[in-house]
């Protein structure tokens, strides 16, 4: 069950990122890193599935009154996500999105529903 207590935005985000990490690990992904920040953007979770780097965006909404958690990932956010992933790949592995095997997944939490996992969100 999702806890919607009065937490700061940052601690609430960390709580959902931890829940997403545990969910993905139960589904066979291996944890690499969390909260990787660059000037161009941030990566919530970096996981690995086989030889594929998985860059995970974690989103949460108490309700979908103002749009769903998934709908909140607009074009600008997608570009920042891609830029941050490219930066991480270069600084850690001297690779790029063009050379590395990677994908972009979303784990969304809405109300008390179970997490919604969307593999390969950016297709």
UniProtKB/Swiss-Prot annotation:
Regions crossing the membrane: none
HAMAP family, A to Z: UPF0102
GO molecular function, one term: nucleic acid binding
Organism name: Actinobacillus pleuropneumoniae serotype 5b (strain L20)
Protein name as annotated: UPF0102 protein APL_1363
Family the UniProt entry places it in: Belongs to the UPF0102 family.
InterPro entries, alphabetized: Restrct_endonuc-II-like, tRNA_endonuc-like_dom_sf, UPF0102_YraN-like
């Amino acid at each position: 069950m999702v806890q919607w207590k009065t937490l700061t935005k940052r601690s609430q985000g960390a709580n959902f990122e931890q829940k997403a990490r545990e969910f993905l690990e139960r589904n066979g992904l291996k944890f690499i890193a969390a909260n990787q920040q660059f000037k161009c953007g941030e990566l919530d979770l970096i996981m690995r599935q086989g030889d594929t780097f998985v860059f995970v965006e974690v989103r949460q909404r108490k309700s979908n009154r103002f749009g769903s958690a998934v709908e909140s990932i607009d074009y600008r956010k997608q570009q920042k996500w891609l830029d941050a992933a490219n930066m991480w790949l270069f600084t850690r592995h001297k690779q790029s999105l063009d050379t590395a095997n990677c994908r972009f997944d979303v784990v969304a939490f809405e109300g008390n529903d179970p997490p919604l996992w969307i593999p390969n969100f950016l297709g």
